[in-house]
Amino acid sequence: MGGAALVMAALREPELFRALVLYEPIIFPPQVRVGITNTGVPSPLANGARRRRSTFASFDEAISNYSSKPPLNVMRSDALRAYVMHGFRAQHDGISIKCSPEHEARTYEMGAIHETWNDLPKLRVPVWLVSGEVIPHTPGAIAALIANEVSGSTLVQWNDLGHFGPMQDPQRFAQLIAQVDAATQ
């Protein structure tokens, strides 16, 4: 959801940005937004967040847990370690996640409501839209649609990565950012 937030910021204050590199931003076209918000069916992502385990005995236990099952098991080990070390706080009886499950669930529920899609043609900052494998009904499937709405944008498709692509292959993502930085100096 950081990509959507950056787009919103660039629409308001474009002078703050030389370029945007966005990985599967959560910006839905109107027909998808309506389908998501009017179904009356609870979001599976929100429900999953509410059920997510929020405490562990130790950082190592959390890393072991996340590395053994989807979706975080695809992350490179150093990225997963950083995710846990910075996403949890120590407490007297172990560690607890910094972002409460309810807050995360609300973020998923609200992510489909913003109307940033309608303003994409107004974006005047160079944009690189990066997507992992295109799977129906995922943010990867929408990246090309977003690119079509942003004049002059560049679509980068990495079919060997999923939605956690920057954490699966941080080096490749860093190289792209360096290329964009050099191209927009």
Task: Describe every region a protein language model picked out.
Residues 31-34, 140-141, 168:
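Conserved catalytic-core motifs of eukaryotic protein kinase domains, centered on the activation segment
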Residues 17-18, 150-153, 161:
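Core-facing hydrophobic residues within beta-strands of well-ordered domains
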Residues 30-92, 107:
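Helix-rich cap/lid subdomain of alpha/beta-hydrolase
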